[in-house]
């Protein structure tokens, strides 16, 4: 009874903090409050509080249920939110190198935590006895590695998507054409002395615009390089987790069902996802290929992860149907 009450308290605390942080993020996005009051730093601290709240929630549920809390969709979502919070905290405490990971990890943790604790999964938070197939020491190894892999791959893929958005965004200034038109117009209407004065003034304005465009494009280039740098490293880490998760799942399947691979829907989509990110890593090793190509592959992998993660849960079929929406 005590553990159940504590679990509900931690759930409400984490969800309340997440809601406040989400509100702060929307306000800072709309009216740029971070320059006025410093709300953005407060939202980062809110994610840290949420991390400890989710950690306490997982440990409480572990003690209360008697097994590692990864037996259904609700628990896996909480663990996925916890994984995003870890990545966010690494970015938060590593302030010597300025990066933009928190712009990806914080909203991701917020929405996943909000979905997991919302009324959409009101039947799933109740802890239940594990089915015989899940009563194994491989549960912690296999599922935790898969969820950590999902979290890292989703984060890296979102960084790649952001890279594509920034790369294909139209930046070319129209100042050049306007100045050329003004120059010919003034040349026809004014005398040489007047035109010389105006032309000098326009040259100064043009030089200022060139400097502004150069600094903006330089910052844009630096941002693209940083997104590519972090996405490659996070996806590489997630690929390792995913590989370990698939291999441990194969060993577990052999012990339970007598076969390493059964082409279950979840297994099939996990293999497809693994192949896509293997292609991504192969592309990154080729220096002659642009970063845009690898970012496109990572964007495809982003969709495949959600299909792999939610597809079987929505259908409720196959050997992994115990984690579906309909199973509880």
From Swiss-Prot:
GO terms for molecular function: heme binding. This is Cytochrome c biogenesis protein CcsA. Its main location: plastid. The gene is ccsA. May interact with Ccs1. One of its GO terms (cellular component) is plasma membrane. Belongs to the CcmF/CycK/Ccl1/NrfE/CcsA family. The keyword Transit peptide does not apply. The chain crosses the membrane at residues 13-33, 46-66, 73-93, 101-121, 146-166, 234-254, 263-283, 295-315. Keywords: Chloroplast, Cytochrome c-type biogenesis, Membrane, Plastid, Thylakoid, Transmembrane, Transmembrane helix.
């Amino acid at each position: 009874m005590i553990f159940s009450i504590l679990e509900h308290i931690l759930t409400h605390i984490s969800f309340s903090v997440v809601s406040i942080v989400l509100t702060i993020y929307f306000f800072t996005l709309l009216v740029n409050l971070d320059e006025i009051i410093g709300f953005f730093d407060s939202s980062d601290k809110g994610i840290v509080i949420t991390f400890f709240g989710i950690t306490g929630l997982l440990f409480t549920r572990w003690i209360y249920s008697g097994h590692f809390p990864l037996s259904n969709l609700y628990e896996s979502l909480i663990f996925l939110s916890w994984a995003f919070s870890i990545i966010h905290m690494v970015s938060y405490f590593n302030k010597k190198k300025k990066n933009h990971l928190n712009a990806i990890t914080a909203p991701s943790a917020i929405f996943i935590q909000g979905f997991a604790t919302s009324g959409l999964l009101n039947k799933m938070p109740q802890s239940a006895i594990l089915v015989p197939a899940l009563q194994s020491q491989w549960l912690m190894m296999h599922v935790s590695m898969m969820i950590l892999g999902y979290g890292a791959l989703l984060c890296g893929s979102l960084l790649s998507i952001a890279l594509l958005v920034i790369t294909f965004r139209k930046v070319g200034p129209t100042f050049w054409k306007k100045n050329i038109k003004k120059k010919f117009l003034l040349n026809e209407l004014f005398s040489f002395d007047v035109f010389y004065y105006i032309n000098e003034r326009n040259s100064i304005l043009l030089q200022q615009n060139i400097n502004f465009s150069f600094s903006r494009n330089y910052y844009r280039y630096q941002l693209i390089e940083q997104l590519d740098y972090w996405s490659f490293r996070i996806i590489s880490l997630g690929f390792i987790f995913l590989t370990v998760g698939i291999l441990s799942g194969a060993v577990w399947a052999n012990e339970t069902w007598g076969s390493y691979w059964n082409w279950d829907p979840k297994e099939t989509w996990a293999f497809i996802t693994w192949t896509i990110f293997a292609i991504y890593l192969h592309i990154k090793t080729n220096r002659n290929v642009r970063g845009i190509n690898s970012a496109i592959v990572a964007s495809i992998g982003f969709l495949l992860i959600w299909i792999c993660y939610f597809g079987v849960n929505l259908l409720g079929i196959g050997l992994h149907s115990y984690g579906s929406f309909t199973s509880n």
